[in-house]
Amino acid sequence: MDDLFAAHDALAVADLIRTRKLGATEVLDGTLANLHRLNKSLNAITDFYDDAPPAADGPFHGVPYVIKQLMADCAGHPTTVGSKFFANQPVATADSAAVARMRRAGLVIVGRTNTSEFGLAPTTEPAFGGATINPWRNDLSPGGSSGGSAAIVAARGLPMGHATDGGGSIRIPAGLCGLFGLKPSRGRISLAPIGETLAGAGAQHCVSLSVRDSAALLDATAGSEPGDPYAAPSPSGSFLDATKRAPGKLRVAFVRKPVGGEALDPVLVRAIERTAKLLEELGHQVEEASPQYDAAALDAAFWRIMAANTWTNIQLRAAGRVPGPGDLEPVTQLVAERGRAITADEYIRSVQAFHRTGRALGAFFEKHDVLLSTTIARTSLPLGTVRMDGTLDAFDRRVAPMTAFTAVCNATGVPAMSVPIEWSDDGLPIGMHFVARYGAEETLYALAAQLEHARPWRNRRP
C-alpha cells in the first residue's frame, strides 16, 4: 500500500475500489498509516481526521484527500489559517461549498495540511506548527503557501491534495515539488460561504501527480453558488474530455524575464528555451513576446489589497479578541497594521490597477493563446529564504522572485498552470508556467496532457 499512489493516480484507485480489486477500508487504513509515517519527516499534515463519513459514489469514490488550513472549512473541525492566534478557533458548523462538492465526488477527507500564516508567504514555514520539508531535499522548502499538500503528494502519500492560490500558492509549490498545479479562472470554483478573497485574486483547486486527476476534480467542483460575485464562463465540455483531445496549433508566446523584473538565472532561461523548442516540435507556433503592463504599480496594488484583507480577516475571525505579543508573526502584524491604515481611495485605486492589468492581458491574448515562462524566478528555495521578519519592504524583496510570473494571473483572474517538464542539473524539478485567456482552462488541460505524454514526469520522484 505504501506505493499505491506511485503506481496509480486518483481516478485509477477509485476504479480499483469500484471494481472491488481493492477495498475502500483497505485503501483508507493503508494510506493513513503511510501518511503518519511520511509526516514524521515532512511535517506536511497538521491534523488527521478519523471521523470521515462513508465515501460518496462519485468519480473519486474512496480516494483519501487532504484540505489546506486556509480558504476552506471542514464541518466539525477548526480552520487555523496557519496562525497561533487562531489555534483554538471554533469548529466549522458546515463544509465550505467546494469541500462539500469534493465529498460528493467521493473523496475521503483525512486531514488538513500546513500553510504559511494567512498564506502571506510563498513558503510553508509557519511559527505555529513549524516548517514543511520538501521531499526532494530536506534543506529545501516545498514552496507555499500550499506546501503541506504539495510535499505529501510529491512523496506519493496521496495522488492529489487541496491547494489555494492568492498569488501563486498552487503553482509555486507544484513547481518546486515536481507536480501539476492549475489555478482556475476567477469564479470557476466557488469560495462560498465567503464573498471573495483579495478583490477576486483568490482561487482554490489542487496539486496532483496527473493532469487528468486535476481535470476530473475541476469537473466535480466547478460552478457558482447562489449569490457568488463572480462566475467563470461555462466550458464547451468537460475538463477531463479536454485532456483526451489534441490542443490544436496554439499561438505560444514566451518570455525570458518577468515584466519589469530582473534577468533570470541561465538555468531557467535554458529551461524556457528547451520548452519553447518542444512546443515547436509539437506543432505550435512559438515566438518571443511579452504582455505590457506596469508591474511596479501592480505589485504596490497587490500589497495594499492583501494588507487590507489581512486586517479585515483578522477582525472578522477574532470576534472581538485582540492579538497579543507573539500571537501573530512579525510580518503578519506589520501587514495587518498597514491594512488598517489604507484609505478607501487607496483601495479603490488598487482594484482599478488590477482591472487595468486585466485589460492589458486581455489584449495580449487576442494575439496569443498561451504565455510561457518558468513558474518562479528561482532555481530552488532553501528553508529560511522567505522569513516572516524585518520590514515589509525587505519581505517584499524576498517574495518578489517567487511571484514574479504568478501573481499577475491572480490580479487578472486568468487561468494558469505549472507543469513539471524541466529539471535542474542536480535533479530538482523546474516548473514551467503556462497562462491562457480568462475561461480557457480547456486549452491549458489539452496542452498539459500533450506535454505529459511528450515528457512524462510520474516516474521522476524524490
Walk through the language-model features, giving the residues of each.
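Short glycine/serine-rich loop segments
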Residues: 94-226, 410-411, 415-431
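Short, surface-exposed loop/helix-turn segments at secondary-structure junctions
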Residues: 84, 231, 305, 349, ...
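Acyltransferase
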Residues: 24-29, 96, 238-241, 264-291, ...
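Short, well-ordered alpha-helical
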Residues: 1-91, 119-121, 239, 243, ...
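Short, gly/Ser/Thr-rich active-site loops of penicillin-recognizing serine hydrolases
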Residues: 345, 444-462
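Residue-level signal for inorganic ion chemistry
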Residues: 31, 214, 252, 279, ...
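Short helix-loop capping/hinge segments that flank enzyme active sites or metal/cofactor-binding pockets
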Residues: 60-84, 244-256, 305-362, 374-378, ...
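A short helix-breaking turn/cap at a secondary-structure junction
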Residues: 183-270, 274-275, 293, 454-462
